[in-house]
């Protein structure tokens, strides 16, 4: 019996001809430093080959309609099962997705309310639950004799026939925010006081407004209430005006209809066709819960059926842990003949919900917008969705499943992985958390360093064996035998000596009113079990409140008070990937590339050849490679197969034309370098090459200090992991000079 996957000659990213056997039907953990090749082995080899080979078994017709992965750079991979990957950063769902739709728990609830509810007749009388609904028979009201059909599960869906007509099933309505229409009331209308008329409407609207009887040459604050009412809500009357064109200085007589400021925004919103157009309009809008459905997204008819005295929207507001108890009591509340059907529906609900409860998501309600969930919550939703079908013979590749998990929630995660193995599957996970690594059956450690210094298997065995292996770098930290060094903490008596940021909020989501104080000039950590309110406190309250206060806007509705003296900027540094543009590199994002271009433009070679700093841009400059247009690679369209990306045959991935090599920068140590030479170096080597360039050296040193010395300057940012992206964003901020305007910054 085959008991392992054989990998021979793996060369994905920085892997150096790796030969390794990965046990099947076990939990296998891949550990190592950031950039050591963990994800390259797990996702770039195991998942890529497992999924590709499964897809190749499908017909050509089917494969042409699917996104296919290219063959991994590996000599041989034997005995790899069909693979599923749970990525580190699941995509942020759209506005129509909720926790209930994402987990598909709402499907069971809609079926429950369709088949088992007390339904309301057209005259408002409720009928007791009956099997006639499941049989598709008409119902007759015993009180008024009205005949009607109970709603189907489809008619209870807010993304379909059950949607609220006012908000179209989104639960929110966009209305014009009057406070944004005149941001500076010291200006006159002629000077552009009415903002929508400047960006969304023709400039002649000020002339029409004047004909409506509004003074346009006095500050807006001095207008009468009647004049302001005309500006905001005036009637759409046609006026005869004399329009003076600013370009031709000619006057023209026109008949033009007056569009008040509010209607100008509403009209522009109705015509929005793309994201760019929406951005022009959204600054004049505010969101509020739909007044008709109260934010439930459901129509009045979809909210009518009741089970155990509650409607669908009411049970969707319950935390999942409470909802499970409520669902368990449904069969007993029904007539005897309906209980078998009720038990079947409730068992289906409970089976899916159990996985989510095991993963610590019992505090979430089904109506919670999926876009407001944290990364860890979305990843656990993804994990629960993948494991609920009880498949067998599948390879599950998990990329840092412990992200966002409190140590107390890790037991549930490990239990889910053990259940997968018990069902005959194999689990490969990439992680840094020693508590998760200790639960694995087998460990493979990559290293010894990162980037070019990594890509090798330095140790493998059981966690206990690695803890005693002198070649292992993570071994000493397993089973609590060692701990990472800690920085000295500020003393309690001086903790708030540099000032305080004070915040208080009302209830939001499942989080009760909060009050918190953050010391200025200190490193503050917000921690707690999943669902305790970390994201709500920081990302949904503190950050937007600071941004609004700095911009002079009203605080978010749920923020009661904010006291942040001296804070003039707030920077959010999260772990979301840095775009999808291959033209973005480590050098450009870390603000190094511009400095290098200026340096090379000052060289004698550049002056002799007539090159300016702009010519050294691989995106738009004269020296970019004409074959690949500065991307460093070209895409080959292969019929019936996935597109193949290969290094550009002319520049060999350097992004520059051969003429760029003729411009040399001479360091004080006598060495000369071209810009393509520097872009091919990793940060560690570039530090010594750029030792004479103060600004470049400082910014590269920050990257080195943050453990990113293994990245090459020309590395594409979309290829970076979430942790690497976060550290690069941090380096980008730390590399900026701390001028007076930057002292009042809050970094989150």
Where in this protein do the model-derived segments appear?
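Conserved phosphate-binding elements of NTP-dependent enzyme cores
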Residues: 1-745
């Amino acid at each position: 019996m085959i008991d392992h996957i054989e990998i021979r000659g793996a060369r994905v990213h920085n892997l150096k001809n790796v030969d390794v056997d990965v046990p099947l039907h076990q939990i296998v953990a891949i550990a190592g430093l950031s950039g050591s090749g963990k994800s390259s082995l797990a996702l770039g080899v195991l998942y890529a080959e497992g999924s590709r080979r499964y897809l190749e078994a499908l017909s050509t017709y089917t494969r042409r309609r699917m996104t296919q992965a290219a063959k991994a750079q590996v000599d041989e991979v034997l005995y790899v099962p069909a693979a599923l990957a749970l990525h580190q950063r699941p995509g942020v769902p759209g506005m129509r997705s909720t926790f209930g739709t994402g987990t598909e728990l709402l499907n069971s609830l809609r079926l429950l309310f369709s088949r088992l509810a007390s339904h309301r007749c057209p005259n408002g009388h409720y009928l007791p639950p009956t099997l006639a609904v499941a049989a598709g028979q008409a119902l007759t009201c015993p009180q008024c004799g009205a005949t009607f059909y109970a709603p189907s599960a489809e008619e209870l869906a807010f993304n379909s026939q059950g949607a609220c007509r006012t908000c179209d099933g989104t639960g929110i309505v966009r209305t014009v925010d009057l406070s944004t229409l005149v941001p500076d009331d010291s200006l006159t209308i002629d000077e552009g006081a009415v903002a929508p008329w400047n960006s969304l409407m023709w400039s002649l609207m000020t002339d029409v407004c004047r004909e409506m009887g509004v003074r346009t040459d006095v500050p807006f604050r001095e207008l009468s209430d009647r004049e302001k009412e005309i500006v905001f809500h005036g009637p759409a009357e046609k006026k005869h005006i004399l329009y003076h064109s600013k370009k031709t200085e000619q006057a023209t007589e026109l008949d033009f209809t007056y569009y008040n400021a509010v209607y100008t925004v509403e009209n522009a919103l109705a015509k929005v066709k793309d994201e760019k157009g929406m951005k022009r309009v959204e600054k004049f809008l505010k969101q509020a819960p739909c007044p008709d459905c109260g934010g439930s997204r459901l129509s009045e008819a979809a909210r009518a059926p009741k089970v155990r005295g509650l409607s669908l929207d009411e049970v969707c507001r319950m935390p999942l842990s409470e909802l499970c108890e409520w669902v368990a009591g449904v069969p007993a509340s029904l007539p005897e003949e309906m209980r078998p059907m009720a038990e079947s529906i409730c068992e289906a609900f409970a089976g899916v919900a159990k996985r989510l409860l095991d993963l610590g998501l019992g505090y979430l309600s089904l109506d919670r917008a999926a876009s407001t969930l944290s990364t860890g919550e979305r990843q656990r939703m993804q994990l629960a969705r993948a494991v609920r079908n009880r498949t067998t013979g599948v390879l599950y590749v998990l990329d840092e499943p412990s992200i966002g998990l409190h140590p107390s929630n890790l037991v549930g995660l490990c239990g889910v992985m053990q259940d997968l193995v018990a069902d005959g599957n194999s689990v490969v996970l990439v992680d840094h958390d020693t508590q998760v690594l200790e639960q694995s059956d087998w460990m493979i450690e990559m290293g010894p360093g990162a980037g070019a210094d990594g890509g090798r298997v330095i140790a493998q065995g059981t966690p206990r064996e690695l803890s005693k292996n002198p070649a292992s770098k993570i071994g000493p930290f397993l089973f609590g035998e060692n701990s990472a060094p800690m920085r000295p903490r500020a003393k309690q008596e001086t903790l708030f000596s540099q000032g305080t940021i004070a915040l208080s909020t009302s209830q939001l989501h499942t989080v009760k009113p909060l009050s918190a104080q953050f010391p200025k000039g200190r490193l503050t950590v917000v921690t707690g079990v999943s669902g305790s309110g970390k994201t709500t406190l920081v990302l949904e309250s503190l950050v937007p409140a600071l941004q609004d206060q700095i911009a002079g806007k009203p605080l978010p509705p749920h923020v009661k008070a904010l006291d942040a003296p001296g804070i003039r900027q707030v920077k959010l540094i999260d772990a979301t990937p840095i775009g999808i543009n291959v033209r973005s590199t480590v050098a450009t994002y870390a603000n190094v590339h511009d400095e290098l271009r200026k340096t090379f433009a000052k060289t004698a070679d550049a002056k002799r050849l007539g090159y300016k700093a702009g010519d050294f841009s691989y995106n738009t400059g004269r020296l970019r490679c004409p074959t690949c247009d500065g991307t460093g690679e070209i895409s080959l369209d292969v019929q019936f197969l996935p597109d193949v990306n290969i290094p550009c045959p002319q520049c060999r991935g350097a992004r520059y034309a051969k003429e760029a090599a003729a411009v040399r920068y001479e360091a004080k140590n006598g060495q000369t370098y071209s810009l393509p030479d520097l872009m091919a170096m990793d940060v560690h080597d570039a530090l010594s090459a750029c030792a004479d360039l103060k600004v470049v050296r400082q910014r590269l040193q920050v990257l080195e200090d943050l453990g990113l010395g293994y990245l090459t300057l020309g590395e594409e940012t979309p290829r970076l992991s979430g942790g690497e992206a976060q550290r690069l964003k941090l380096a980008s901020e730390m590399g900026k000079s701390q001028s007076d305007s930057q002292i009042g910054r809050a970094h989150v």
